[in-house]
């Protein structure tokens, strides 16, 4: 039985990302490029990852860092959403890529931007969702059980001392 593609498409590698890995021009959509770049990370195809960055990114200068990121133990890809950009030569793909490190599983979430230039799709940049700010555990308590010292930061979040704000 043929090996399934690392990108999670439920197709064989030969009928999925290998087509892109053999020739960048075979990539038709931003999602296909994103999936093939993920598979290249899994398979250690540094050249493919470098060559599918937009030329303005100067990825060749970052080859060593790219090679290090490929060394992670990538284990799963989930495509959350693929959407068109502001024109036919721009697209976005939001995804979760899971990897194992030091016995723990981590998830990298990104919204990648792709541009099409001279008939080829390229990865140009991405944004990462901001982490939720840690909530003050005192906010989960009832008001009657809340113990706030006069010099503690105010529970309203103003940054002032409790005694000079709500105390």
Swiss-Prot record:
InterPro entries: NTF2-like_dom_sf, SEC_C_motif, UPF0225, YchJ-like_M. Gene3D superfamilies: 3.10.450.50. Belongs to the UPF0225 family. HAMAP family: UPF0225 (MF_00612). This is UPF0225 protein VV1358.
